[in-house]
């Protein structure tokens, strides 16, 4: 016999005080503390959202059986109930499920909701995993999710330099899609016409302030002149495009002025652009049949700068990929004072070595010097490791490095260990035997704002 009825959404669920108190700290306080009116009631009405009410019977059953069936559709409302009533073991279960099904959530248009909820509730590990998926796979964010993407969340994403994009124009188009969804929502609001216009103008200028127009080529900037949004907010966009053209034409004094402003601090820092101009996809097929310590060498070129000043030049790169680790054989180190034995070392990780083949030599007397020109090559290197989760192929992890190459320092030692020996989640294709890694190399100038190099994901 139950001694309590919990009413949710007009439906009564028989329950037992002892079971509820043993499973939930919130129910324990509610039902045992005399300061709460519910402690003496035999029927308690709980206010839940419609989605919370739909999963409440399963939530309550978990108190008795310790088992619950969750899916990509129900995990968020179950987690919200577990958070609300402080059912810690169920919270852990839901977060574990979410971390293993992030790609599926993206495919089914639920990732933004997962990301924003976990960010708000302090579930930092899952929130970071969701953010990383969005940053590195923005093409998976469908229009239906854009309506749910909050202003502050979008602004947070736009400030990151490790967004993986085809180019900056891709991000511009993403923001336009988001604004179109916001306009639909605003048109159904109760705001007056003047309030609606003020809010819309503020929204446009705020979000586009974080789009890095200087990273667009002149042809892309010219196309933007014809966009309706540009015509509608002509003063704002003309100013941003003028800054972009100053960068593209090498007007360094003007760039330095803009960089000193709060809104211009990050404008001249490239993101991780995947178009052919900036890198190469390294695909290793038949992974399982490769011998240990196998090496693949790839050669490609990138532009030495994002601006058009040196558009006719190329920087040549050689990438050595070790998909099954490296074997450093025993050797001998001879120095002036003594001789040392260097022991054998075997590293099982996937490793990459990057070499710049045409670093500029020391400047000659005919070189036209500018205080912003540098005789070496400073770049940001992005190593994108692909993976598969629930049948969804995506960028699963990113290694980001900043390095300065020169005639005396042609190789980057920082891009060594990319990931542990590939697990099934890192192997693609119908036979799960392809390792896919994309190398992105974007040039940096003194106007770029970059932090310490770090491994992400």
Regions found by a protein language model. Give the residues of each.
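Eukaryotic intrinsically disordered and solvent-exposed regulatory patches
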Residues: 64-65, 338-339, 367-370, 421-426
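Alpha-helical scaffold in the C-terminal half of BTB/POZ domains
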Residues: 13-15, 23, 41, 56, ...
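N-terminal BTB/POZ boundary and linker segment
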Residues: 1-21, 49, 54, 61-73
């Amino acid at each position: 016999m139950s001694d309590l009825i919990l009413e949710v959404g007009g439906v009564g669920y028989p329950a037992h005080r002892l079971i509820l108190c043993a499973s939930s700290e919130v129910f324990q306080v509610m039902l045992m503390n005399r300061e709460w009116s519910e402690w003496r009631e035999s029927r308690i009405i709980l206010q839940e959202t419609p989605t919370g009410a739909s999963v409440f019977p399963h939530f309550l059953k978990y108190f008795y059986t310790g088992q619950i069936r969750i899916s990509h559709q129900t995990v968020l409302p179950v987690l919200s109930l577990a958070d609300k009533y402080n059912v810690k073991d169920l919270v852990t279960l839901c977060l574990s499920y979410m971390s293993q099904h992030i790609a599926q959530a993206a495919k089914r248009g639920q990732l933004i909701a997962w990301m924003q909820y976990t960010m708000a509730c302090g579930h930092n590990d899952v929130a970071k995993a969701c953010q990383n998926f969005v940053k590195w796979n923005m093409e998976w964010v469908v229009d239906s999710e854009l309506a749910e993407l909050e202003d502050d969340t979008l602004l947070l994403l736009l400030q990151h330099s490790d967004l993986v994009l085809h180019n900056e124009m891709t991000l511009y188009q993403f923001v336009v899609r988001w604004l179109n969804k916001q306009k639909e929502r605003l048109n159904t609001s109760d705001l007056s016409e003047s309030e609606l216009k003020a809010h819309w103008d503020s929204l446009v200028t705020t979000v586009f302030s974080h789009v890095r127009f200087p990273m667009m080529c002149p042809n892309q900037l010219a196309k933007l002149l014809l966009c309706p949004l540009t015509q509608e907010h002509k003063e704002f966009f003309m100013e941003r495009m003028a800054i972009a053209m100053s960068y593209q034409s090498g007007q360094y004094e003007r760039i330095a002025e803009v960089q000193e402003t709060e809104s211009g601090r990050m404008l001249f820092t490239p993101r991780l652009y995947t178009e052919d101009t900036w890198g190469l996809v390294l695909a290793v097929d038949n992974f399982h049949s490769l011998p240990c310590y196998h090496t693949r060498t790839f050669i490609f070129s990138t532009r030495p700068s994002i601006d058009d000043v040196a558009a006719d030049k190329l920087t040549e790169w050689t990438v050595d990929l070790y998909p099954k680790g490296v074997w450093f054989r025993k050797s001998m180190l001879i120095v002036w004072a003594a001789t040392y034995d260097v022991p054998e070392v075997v590293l099982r990780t996937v490793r990459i070595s990057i070499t710049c083949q045409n670093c500029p030599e020391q400047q000659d007397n005919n070189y036209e010097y500018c205080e912003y020109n540098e005789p070496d090559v400073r770049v940001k290197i992005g190593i994108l490791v692909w993976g598969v989760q629930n049948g969804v192929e995506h960028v699963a992890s990113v290694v980001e490095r900043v390095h300065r190459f020169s005639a005396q320092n042609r190789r980057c030692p920082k891009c060594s260990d990319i990931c542990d020996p590939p697990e099934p989640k890192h192997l693609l294709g119908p036979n799960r035997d392809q390792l896919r890694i994309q190398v992105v190399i974007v040039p940096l100038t003194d106007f770029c704002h970059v932090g310490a190099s770090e491994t992400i994901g």
